[in-house]
Protein backbone atom coordinates (compact mmCIF):
# COMPACT_ATOMS: atom_id res chain seq x y z
CA UNK A 1 0.00 0.00 0.00
CA UNK A 2 2.84 2.37 0.84
CA UNK A 3 4.36 1.75 -2.59
CA UNK A 4 1.05 2.49 -4.30
CA UNK A 5 0.60 5.68 -2.25
CA UNK A 6 4.13 6.80 -3.06
CA UNK A 7 3.58 6.11 -6.76
CA UNK A 8 0.36 8.13 -6.79
CA UNK A 9 2.12 11.04 -5.07
CA UNK A 10 4.94 10.98 -7.61
CA UNK A 11 2.47 10.96 -10.50
CA UNK A 12 0.57 13.91 -9.00
CA UNK A 13 3.77 15.90 -8.54
CA UNK A 14 4.92 15.13 -12.08
CA UNK A 15 1.53 16.17 -13.42
CA UNK A 16 1.72 19.45 -11.52
CA UNK A 17 5.24 20.12 -12.79
CA UNK A 18 4.17 19.42 -16.37
CA UNK A 19 1.20 21.80 -16.00
CA UNK A 20 3.36 24.54 -14.54
CA UNK A 21 5.96 24.09 -17.27
CA UNK A 22 3.27 24.25 -19.93
CA UNK A 23 1.88 27.44 -18.39
CA UNK A 24 5.33 29.04 -18.33
CA UNK A 25 5.89 28.12 -21.97
CA UNK A 26 2.56 29.67 -22.93
CA UNK A 27 3.41 32.85 -20.99
CA UNK A 28 6.83 33.08 -22.63
CA UNK A 29 5.26 32.53 -26.04
CA UNK A 30 2.65 35.22 -25.36
CA UNK A 31 5.33 37.67 -24.22
CA UNK A 32 7.48 36.95 -27.26
CA UNK A 33 4.63 37.92 -29.59
CA UNK A 34 4.41 41.46 -28.18
CA UNK A 35 5.99 43.75 -30.77
CA UNK A 36 8.15 46.72 -29.86
CA UNK A 37 7.40 50.20 -31.19
CA UNK A 38 10.73 52.02 -31.52
CA UNK A 39 10.08 55.75 -31.27
CA UNK A 40 12.83 58.32 -31.84
CA UNK A 41 12.99 61.77 -30.27
CA UNK A 42 15.62 64.23 -29.05
CA UNK A 43 14.83 63.82 -25.35
CA UNK A 44 15.95 67.42 -24.96
CA UNK A 45 13.12 69.54 -26.34
CA UNK A 46 10.80 70.44 -23.45
CA UNK A 47 7.85 70.35 -23.20
CA UNK A 48 7.68 67.91 -26.13
CA UNK A 49 10.35 65.60 -24.75
CA UNK A 50 13.16 65.67 -22.22
CA UNK A 51 15.59 63.49 -20.27
CA UNK A 52 15.29 62.82 -16.53
CA UNK A 53 16.99 60.49 -14.06
CA UNK A 54 13.96 58.52 -12.84
CA UNK A 55 10.56 57.25 -13.93
CA UNK A 56 8.51 59.89 -12.10
CA UNK A 57 5.22 61.00 -13.69
CA UNK A 58 5.29 57.98 -16.00
CA UNK A 59 8.64 58.49 -17.71
CA UNK A 60 9.98 55.55 -19.73
CA UNK A 61 13.54 54.21 -20.07
CA UNK A 62 15.69 55.50 -22.91
CA UNK A 63 17.23 52.68 -24.93
CA UNK A 64 20.88 51.94 -24.10
CA UNK A 65 20.83 54.46 -21.27
CA UNK A 66 20.26 54.71 -17.52
CA UNK A 67 18.08 57.78 -18.05
CA UNK A 68 14.36 58.18 -18.72
CA UNK A 69 12.33 60.24 -21.18
CA UNK A 70 9.11 62.13 -20.61
CA UNK A 71 7.10 64.99 -22.05
CA UNK A 72 4.19 65.44 -24.45
CA UNK A 73 5.76 63.20 -27.10
CA UNK A 74 6.34 60.40 -24.60
CA UNK A 75 2.77 60.70 -23.34
CA UNK A 76 1.54 60.39 -26.91
CA UNK A 77 3.91 57.52 -27.70
CA UNK A 78 2.72 55.62 -24.61
CA UNK A 79 -0.90 56.09 -25.63
CA UNK A 80 -0.27 54.94 -29.21
CA UNK A 81 1.74 51.91 -28.10
CA UNK A 82 -0.90 50.90 -25.56
CA UNK A 83 -3.78 51.22 -28.03
CA UNK A 84 -1.94 49.24 -30.71
CA UNK A 85 -0.65 46.55 -28.35
CA UNK A 86 3.03 47.43 -28.64
CA UNK A 87 5.81 47.61 -26.07
CA UNK A 88 7.29 51.13 -26.24
CA UNK A 89 11.00 51.78 -26.68
CA UNK A 90 12.26 55.38 -26.78
CA UNK A 91 15.40 56.00 -28.84
CA UNK A 92 17.34 59.20 -28.19
CA UNK A 93 18.72 60.89 -31.33
CA UNK A 94 19.80 64.38 -32.31
CA UNK A 95 17.41 66.39 -34.47
CA UNK A 96 19.15 65.87 -37.81
CA UNK A 97 19.26 62.10 -37.28
CA UNK A 98 15.51 61.66 -36.80
CA UNK A 99 14.31 61.45 -40.40
CA UNK A 100 17.28 59.32 -41.57
CA UNK A 101 16.55 56.89 -38.73
CA UNK A 102 13.00 56.40 -40.01
CA UNK A 103 14.20 56.04 -43.59
CA UNK A 104 16.78 53.41 -42.65
CA UNK A 105 14.33 51.45 -40.52
CA UNK A 106 16.41 51.72 -37.34
CA UNK A 107 13.28 53.16 -35.69
CA UNK A 108 9.61 52.72 -36.51
CA UNK A 109 8.57 56.34 -36.21
CA UNK A 110 9.51 59.76 -34.89
CA UNK A 111 7.38 61.57 -32.33
CA UNK A 112 9.41 64.69 -31.70
CA UNK A 113 7.46 67.86 -32.39
CA UNK A 114 8.09 67.71 -36.15
CA UNK A 115 6.15 70.02 -38.46
CA UNK A 116 4.53 68.28 -41.42
CA UNK A 117 6.42 70.17 -44.12
CA UNK A 118 6.45 69.45 -47.84
CA UNK A 119 10.22 68.89 -47.71
CA UNK A 120 9.88 66.21 -45.04
CA UNK A 121 6.95 64.63 -46.87
CA UNK A 122 9.29 63.89 -49.76
CA UNK A 123 11.35 61.70 -47.40
CA UNK A 124 8.83 60.18 -44.99
CA UNK A 125 5.09 59.84 -44.48
CA UNK A 126 3.24 61.68 -41.73
CA UNK A 127 0.18 60.89 -39.69
CA UNK A 128 -2.58 63.39 -39.14
CA UNK A 129 -1.52 66.11 -36.64
CA UNK A 130 -1.14 65.23 -32.99
CA UNK A 131 -0.68 68.89 -32.06
CA UNK A 132 -1.16 72.34 -33.59
CA UNK A 133 1.60 74.77 -32.59
CA UNK A 134 1.46 78.50 -33.32
CA UNK A 135 4.76 80.25 -34.04
CA UNK A 136 5.93 83.08 -31.80
CA UNK A 137 9.07 84.91 -30.70
CA UNK A 138 10.83 85.05 -27.35
CA UNK A 139 12.81 88.02 -26.09
CA UNK A 140 14.14 89.26 -22.77
CA UNK A 141 11.89 91.50 -20.70
CA UNK A 142 14.55 94.22 -20.63
CA UNK A 143 15.08 94.09 -24.40
CA UNK A 144 14.22 97.05 -26.62
CA UNK A 145 12.07 94.58 -28.57
CA UNK A 146 9.94 93.61 -25.55
CA UNK A 147 7.14 95.97 -26.62
CA UNK A 148 6.98 94.69 -30.21
CA UNK A 149 3.43 94.40 -31.58
CA UNK A 150 4.32 92.66 -34.84
CA UNK A 151 7.26 91.31 -36.79
CA UNK A 152 7.87 94.72 -38.38
CA UNK A 153 8.84 95.96 -34.91
CA UNK A 154 11.62 93.36 -34.85
CA UNK A 155 13.41 94.92 -37.83
CA UNK A 156 17.18 95.04 -37.50
CA UNK A 157 17.28 92.70 -34.52
CA UNK A 158 19.84 89.96 -33.99
CA UNK A 159 18.20 86.55 -33.87
CA UNK A 160 18.50 82.80 -34.25
CA UNK A 161 16.49 79.62 -33.89
CA UNK A 162 16.93 75.86 -34.06
CA UNK A 163 18.62 74.18 -37.00
CA UNK A 164 16.38 72.49 -39.53
CA UNK A 165 13.14 74.13 -38.42
CA UNK A 166 10.53 76.28 -40.11
CA UNK A 167 11.29 78.89 -37.45
CA UNK A 168 14.81 79.37 -38.80
CA UNK A 169 14.32 78.59 -42.48
CA UNK A 170 10.98 80.32 -43.11
CA UNK A 171 10.14 82.75 -40.32
CA UNK A 172 13.31 84.66 -39.44
CA UNK A 173 13.99 85.68 -43.08
CA UNK A 174 10.62 87.50 -43.05
CA UNK A 175 11.95 90.04 -40.53
CA UNK A 176 13.27 93.14 -42.29
CA UNK A 177 17.04 93.60 -42.04
CA UNK A 178 17.29 90.91 -39.38
CA UNK A 179 20.80 89.85 -38.39
CA UNK A 180 20.31 86.10 -38.45
CA UNK A 181 23.05 84.21 -36.63
CA UNK A 182 23.88 80.56 -37.39
CA UNK A 183 21.16 78.11 -36.39
CA UNK A 184 21.46 76.41 -33.02
CA UNK A 185 21.78 72.63 -32.72
CA UNK A 186 18.94 72.28 -30.21
CA UNK A 187 16.10 74.10 -28.48
CA UNK A 188 18.07 74.44 -25.22
CA UNK A 189 20.97 75.97 -27.18
CA UNK A 190 18.79 78.69 -28.70
CA UNK A 191 17.37 79.49 -25.26
CA UNK A 192 20.89 79.85 -23.88
CA UNK A 193 21.71 82.21 -26.77
CA UNK A 194 18.77 84.41 -25.79
CA UNK A 195 19.39 84.21 -22.05
CA UNK A 196 23.04 85.21 -22.53
CA UNK A 197 21.87 88.09 -24.75
CA UNK A 198 23.90 86.98 -27.73
CA UNK A 199 20.66 87.55 -29.65
CA UNK A 200 17.77 89.97 -29.21
CA UNK A 201 15.10 87.36 -29.82
CA UNK A 202 14.50 83.84 -31.06
CA UNK A 203 11.68 82.24 -33.02
CA UNK A 204 10.00 79.07 -31.76
CA UNK A 205 6.54 77.61 -31.13
CA UNK A 206 4.14 78.38 -28.32
CA UNK A 207 4.63 75.20 -26.22
CA UNK A 208 8.41 75.63 -26.28
CA UNK A 209 8.01 79.27 -25.27
CA UNK A 210 5.57 78.45 -22.46
CA UNK A 211 8.05 75.96 -21.08
CA UNK A 212 10.93 78.42 -21.51
CA UNK A 213 9.43 81.25 -19.46
CA UNK A 214 9.11 78.86 -16.52
CA UNK A 215 12.80 78.02 -16.73
CA UNK A 216 13.76 81.60 -17.62
CA UNK A 217 11.37 84.06 -15.89
CA UNK A 218 13.25 87.00 -17.43
CA UNK A 219 11.99 86.06 -20.89
CA UNK A 220 8.81 87.32 -22.55
CA UNK A 221 6.61 85.78 -25.25
CA UNK A 222 5.87 87.91 -28.32
CA UNK A 223 2.69 86.51 -29.84
CA UNK A 224 1.61 88.17 -33.08
CA UNK A 225 -0.82 85.45 -34.22
CA UNK A 226 -3.92 87.61 -33.76
CA UNK A 227 -2.50 90.50 -35.80
CA UNK A 228 -1.96 91.25 -39.48
CA UNK A 229 1.75 91.68 -38.78
CA UNK A 230 2.61 88.05 -38.15
CA UNK A 231 4.81 85.44 -39.82
CA UNK A 232 3.38 84.12 -43.07
CA UNK A 233 3.26 80.37 -42.68
CA UNK A 234 1.12 77.56 -44.06
CA UNK A 235 -0.89 75.02 -42.12
CA UNK A 236 1.84 72.46 -42.70
CA UNK A 237 4.22 74.67 -40.73
CA UNK A 238 2.14 74.53 -37.56
CA UNK A 239 0.76 70.99 -37.85
CA UNK A 240 2.84 68.57 -35.77
CA UNK A 241 2.78 64.93 -36.86
CA UNK A 242 4.32 61.50 -36.38
CA UNK A 243 6.76 60.61 -39.17
CA UNK A 244 6.79 57.03 -40.47
CA UNK A 245 8.66 55.26 -43.25
CA UNK A 246 7.00 55.34 -46.67
CA UNK A 247 7.52 51.57 -46.66
CA UNK A 248 5.21 51.16 -43.67
CA UNK A 249 1.78 52.60 -44.59
CA UNK A 250 0.12 50.10 -42.25
CA UNK A 251 1.72 51.75 -39.22
CA UNK A 252 0.74 55.22 -40.43
CA UNK A 253 -2.86 54.04 -40.79
CA UNK A 254 -2.83 52.39 -37.37
CA UNK A 255 -1.50 55.51 -35.63
CA UNK A 256 -4.06 57.65 -37.46
CA UNK A 257 -6.73 55.38 -36.01
CA UNK A 258 -5.54 56.19 -32.50
CA UNK A 259 -5.24 59.93 -33.17
CA UNK A 260 -8.78 59.98 -34.57
CA UNK A 261 -10.08 59.17 -31.09
CA UNK A 262 -8.53 62.36 -29.65
CA UNK A 263 -9.68 65.97 -29.87
CA UNK A 264 -7.82 69.28 -29.89
CA UNK A 265 -8.91 69.70 -26.27
CA UNK A 266 -7.27 66.35 -25.48
CA UNK A 267 -4.05 67.51 -27.13
CA UNK A 268 -4.07 70.78 -25.19
CA UNK A 269 -4.78 69.05 -21.87
CA UNK A 270 -1.85 66.69 -22.43
CA UNK A 271 0.44 69.58 -23.34
CA UNK A 272 -0.61 71.54 -20.25
CA UNK A 273 0.28 68.53 -18.12
CA UNK A 274 3.65 68.16 -19.84
CA UNK A 275 4.47 71.82 -19.20
CA UNK A 276 3.46 71.51 -15.54
CA UNK A 277 5.73 68.54 -14.83
CA UNK A 278 8.79 69.43 -16.89
CA UNK A 279 11.86 69.33 -14.60
CA UNK A 280 12.53 73.07 -14.73
CA UNK A 281 8.94 73.90 -13.68
CA UNK A 282 9.51 72.53 -10.16
Predicted segments, located by residue:
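Ligand-binding clefts/hinges and TM-proximal coupling segments of bilobed small-molecule sensing domains
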Residues: 166-185, 221-223, 253-282
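Extracytoplasmic small-molecule ligand-binding "clamshell" domains
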Residues: 30-114
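A ligand-binding cleft/hinge motif common to bilobed small-molecule-binding domains
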Residues: 96-97, 113-123, 170-174, 200-236
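Periplasmic-binding protein-like
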Residues: 132-139, 214-259, 277-282
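Bilobed "Venus flytrap"/periplasmic-binding protein-like clamshell domains
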Residues: 43-46, 66-83, 114, 136-191, ...
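Short, low-complexity disordered leader/linker segments with a strong preference
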Residues: 1-36, 282
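Acidic, polar ligand-binding/catalytic clefts
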Residues: 82, 87-153, 227, 232-235
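Alpha-to-beta junction loops
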Residues: 85-87, 103-112, 157-159, 195-208, ...
Amino acid sequence: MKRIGTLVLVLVLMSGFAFAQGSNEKTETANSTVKTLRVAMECGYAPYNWTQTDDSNGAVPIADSNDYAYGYDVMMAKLIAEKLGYKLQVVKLDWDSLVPAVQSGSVDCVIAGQSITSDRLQMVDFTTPYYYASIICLTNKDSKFASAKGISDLAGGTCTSQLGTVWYDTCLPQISHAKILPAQESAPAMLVALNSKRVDFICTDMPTAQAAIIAYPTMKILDFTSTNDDFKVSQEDINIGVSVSKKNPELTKAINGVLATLTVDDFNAMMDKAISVQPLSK
